[in-house]
Amino acid sequence: MNGEAICSALPTIPYHKLADLRYLSRGASGTVSSARHADWRVQVAVKHLHIHTPLLDSERKDVLREAEILHKARFSYILPILGICNEPEFLGIVTEYMPNGSLNELLHRKTEYPDVAWPLRFRILHEIALGVNYLHNMTPPLLHHDLKTQNILLDNEFHVKIADFGLSKWRMMSLSQSRSSKSAPEGGTIIYMPPENYEPGQKSRASIKHDIYSYAVITWEVLSRKQPFEDVTNPLQIMYSVSQGHRPVINEESLPYDIPHRARMISLIESGWAQNPDERPSFLKCLIELEPVLRTFEEITFLEAVIQLKKTKLQSVSSAIHLCDKKKMELSLNIPVNHGPQEESCGSSQLHENSGSPETSRSLPAPQDNDFLSRKAQDCYFMKLHHCPGNHSWDSTISGSQRAAFCDHKTTPCSSAIINPLSTAGNSERLQPGIAQQWIQSKREDIVNQMTEACLNQSLDALLSRDLIMKEDYELVSTKPTRTSKVRQLLDTTDIQGEEFAKVIVQKLKDNKQMGLQPYPEILVVSRSPSLNLLQNKSM
């Protein structure tokens, strides 16, 4: 089958039909965004590769061939593929949009979902097994080999839709084009990978037994609502431990005695993650074990569980919106915020003392013209400013330990004594563009013409790693169809976000030896401190 036949067999969705592209997440298979199809008038999801260098025809055909296979895998618990967007600078798979996110979010966002009823947990496990069993029974069998809670999506009624199966070429292209310097697999994938797959030479033997191992780990995770190996930070430690026969702990703490059908489920887990692949059961046998478990629950209990989740999610969203509206009202009216004792732990007095220094003032970017910002971006921007300034890069005169002492992101917003971006306390105090910003503004068209795709992507990576760019701004840049439009959007964002943002871009231009832009300004790019990153990770 040639590339042209593959293209014609797949429904083609033009890029310009994908309106309102919004960044959702990024994984091994590419970046996922939501969009609204201009003709269908429905929300869709788009998984697209970042094409930093032109794909060879053979590479594009391989990716399209995989998409064609996925399009044929139509089943109740498989994520439906609606078509492909195949354009020179944009290659993406368009699927149905899943409003309830992933199983990973359901299990581990305990504030949003404080309780997930047992009937629903068992239904989810049953539907995962049904979906993978269907893939294994295709001709030829379609093996997932990247089954994890992040790839198990949930529709409006919390039914399972398995995603990212059969995307080995897609993942390969994404990793080869990746901007990250990390070569080791992400810990999230290692957790679900069987030990025989740690050695590349043995991958062919693993075959159909790979997915049942992953499923066993997922089952443990669903029943415990804990992250497997959550205390281990180094993926190599996990690999060594698993290769020695260790698995996530099965005891009363991880799997309490009140779990329905506990003994049967533990037996299924232990056989599924057996060290010897030949001792692991097929998904058919797994389903035979699960079916009597499902029959013990009345149909009404599944409906009640779903309704309860929807209620708690709605309450969580309503609370967040109420808080957001309250903050915006206080900002727009320039009203000081009366914080409780817990919120005062941010140390507003320290911040007030520092706010007088020109260095600190320069490091807190404020929009020069709100017309540059979309309404949603404005809201998020002001919310971000109104929180403790850990999301911004501070001047080098402020140490990481001082920044960490200023606030705990896990709990509280700071006092409004920090800044009010709408304050009218004198135009002379408005933040002026720094050296890097002024240089970028003076070289704008030269940068647009000369900044390479690789340099652009490295800049975005660096901004993400320093938490200097918001998701909304990232998506506005990354989803533009051409290199020049991406660069223009990035420079527009630089005008708004401030000096530290601009410094990163200047540094990346220098690193990529874009000599046509010389002379460069002398700048110092401040790296974020590990202590601050730790605080932020805990808050997410």
Swiss-Prot record:
Organism taxonomic ancestry: Eukaryota, Metazoa, Chordata, Craniata, Vertebrata
Protein name in the entry: Receptor-interacting serine/threonine-protein kinase 2
Function: Serine/threonine/tyrosine-protein kinase that plays an essential role in modulation of innate and adaptive immune responses. Acts as a key effector of NOD1 and NOD2 signaling pathways: upon activation by bacterial peptidoglycans, NOD1 and NOD2 oligomerize and recruit RIPK2 via CARD-CARD domains, leading to the formation of RIPK2 filaments.
Location of region: Disordered: 338-369
Mutation effect (residue 496 to A): Decreased interaction with NGFR
Record note on what altering residue 492 to K does: Abolished activation of NF-kappa-B
Span list, region Helix alphaC: 65-73
GO cellular component, one term: endoplasmic reticulum
(Microbial infection) O-acetylserine PTM positions: 174, 176, 178, 181, 183, 363, 423
Membrane topology: Peripheral membrane protein
Underlying gene: RIPK2
Cross-referenced InterPro entries: CARD, CARD_RIP2, DEATH-like_dom_sf, Kinase-like_dom_sf, Prot_kinase_dom, Rcpt-int_Ser/Thr_kinase-2, Ser-Thr/Tyr_kinase_cat_dom, Ser/Thr_kinase_AS
GO biological process: adaptive immune response; apoptotic process; canonical NF-kappaB signal transduction; CD4-positive, alpha-beta T cell proliferation; cellular response to lipoteichoic acid; cellular response to muramyl dipeptide; cellular response to peptidoglycan; cytokine-mediated signaling pathway
EC number: 2.7.11.1, 2.7.10.2
Effect on the protein of changing residue 503 to R: Abolished ubiquitination by ZNRF4
Active site, renumbered: 146 (proton acceptor)
Residues bound to ATP: 24-32, 47
Catalytic function, reaction form: L-seryl-[protein] + ATP = O-phospho-L-seryl-[protein] + ADP + H(+); L-threonyl-[protein] + ATP = O-phospho-L-threonyl-[protein] + ADP + H(+); L-tyrosyl-[protein] + ATP = O-phospho-L-tyrosyl-[protein] + ADP + H(+)
Impact after mutating residue 444 to E: Abolishes interaction with NOD1. Abolished activation of NF-kappa-B
Pfam families xrefs: CARD, PK_Tyr_Ser-Thr
Effect of residue 461 to R: Abolished activation of NF-kappa-B
